[in-house]
């Protein structure tokens, strides 16, 4: 066979193979395309879900929590969070310095979550643009009166200002029934209060300013300071001193009374919820809660924490550890504790505490009560 014929035959063979291939093709792959795209979308959704679940761990694998609460009230809660989620917590128990630290780190945020013993401090941070709004799962379990408009903070447990007394030294009938009575000379040296910078004291004075005005409140602070037998670092110091009989009574948050009742000794104490009479202001209520710090470095971890803390069992853990009263009405208070619906309370909205928080600190100092010992 000559060379030209071979080329011709080879060309005809190639052409026939091309025709067969073309005729044998169908539109089926094109018809299956939508199903293929659907599978791809499902796979993408599943991948996104997995990514969201793992995102918190992929950021840094940790959560930085600043807290102004007693670390004994917080540590077990944070350990439970780590056990439940796998996210490691780096806590900073900064006491009253937590707020100033967050303010000082503005623009270089280190904290993700702030756990506060004072709603006024949380609202003050929000007003200064240092907290960030959120929509955590379960937020509807917290009444709107106990959370920011943008949910950047929310309360979890309530505490009320009370007079805890030693039953071996005084009877309930003999006890003062109003906060104003603490200026009476008859109580000179008989009671103890905290330093002015304590969160409970700041919130209490803010409520008195709302009720009485600044001048009367300043006079009350000065007179109570002079009348008190001691000014102590914190309420735990007061409750132990009252239980031991070092003072007849002390001005504390109500859960310290319940803590003293659980002591093996020095537990013969009683409690007075002040200003319950007709026309009186009612007992002053504050709350502890959590806030989402703006520009949190571990934003995904912070969101996981907010969702987690609003689960009912964790709300219970938050309040029961300190023997406070849960804000969520669906959670029963600890045995023997009065709920805020059981007594008359002052009507100042907690959200207003933040508006006057810094001014109240200044007024306390002006009245002569040191913020720190």
Where are these regions (language model features)?
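Immediate post-signal peptide segment of exported/extracytoplasmic ligand-binding proteins
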Residues: 28, 32-33, 45-64, 79-85, ...
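Early extracytoplasmic/lumenal segment of secretory-pathway proteins
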Residues: 55-124
């Amino acid at each position: 066979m000559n060379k030209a014929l071979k080329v011709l035959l080879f060309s005809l063979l190639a052409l026939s193979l091309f025709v067969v291939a073309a005729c044998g093709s169908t539109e089926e792959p094109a018809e299956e395309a939508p199903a293929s795209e659907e599978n791809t979308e499902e796979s993408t959704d599943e991948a996104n879900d997995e990514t969201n679940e793992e995102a918190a761990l992929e950021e840094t694998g940790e959560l930085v929590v600043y807290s102004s609460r007693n670390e004994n009230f917080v540590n077990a809660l944070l350990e439970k969070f780590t056990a439940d989620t796998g996210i490691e917590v780096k806590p900073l128990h900064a006491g009253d310095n937590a707020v100033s630290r967050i303010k000082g780190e503005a623009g270089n945020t280190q904290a993700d979550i702030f756990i506060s013993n004072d709603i006024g401090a949380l609202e003050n941070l929000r007003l200064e643009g240092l907290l960030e709004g959120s929509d955590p799962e379960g937020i509807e379990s917290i009444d709107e009166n106990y959370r920011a408009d943008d949910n950047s903070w929310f309360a979890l447990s309530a505490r009320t200002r009370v007079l805890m007394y030693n039953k071996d030294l005084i009877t309930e009938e003999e006890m003062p029934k109003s906060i104003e009575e603490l200026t009476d000379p008859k109580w000179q040296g008989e009671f103890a209060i905290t330093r002015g910078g304590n969160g409970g004291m700041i919130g209490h004075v803010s409520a008195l300013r709302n009720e009485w005005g600044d001048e009367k409140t300043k006079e009350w602070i000065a007179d109570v300071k002079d009348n008190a037998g001691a000014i102590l670092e914190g309420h735990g110091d007061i409750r132990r001193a009252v239980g031991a009989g070092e003072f007849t009574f002390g001005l504390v948050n109500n859960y310290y009374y319940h803590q003293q009742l659980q002591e093996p000794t020095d537990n013969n104490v009683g409690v007075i919820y002040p200003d319950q009479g007709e026309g009186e202001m009612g007992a002053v209520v504050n709350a502890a809660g959590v806030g989402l710090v703006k520009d949190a470095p571990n934003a995904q971890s912070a969101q996981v924490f907010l969702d987690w803390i609003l689960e009912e069992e964790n709300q219970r853990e938050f309040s029961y550890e300190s023997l406070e009263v849960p804000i969520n009405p669906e959670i029963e208070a600890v045995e023997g504790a009065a709920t805020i619906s059981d007594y008359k309370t002052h009507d100042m909205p907690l959200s207003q505490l933040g508006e006057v928080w810094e001014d109240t600190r200044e007024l306390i100092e002006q009245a002569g009560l040191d913020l720190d010992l």
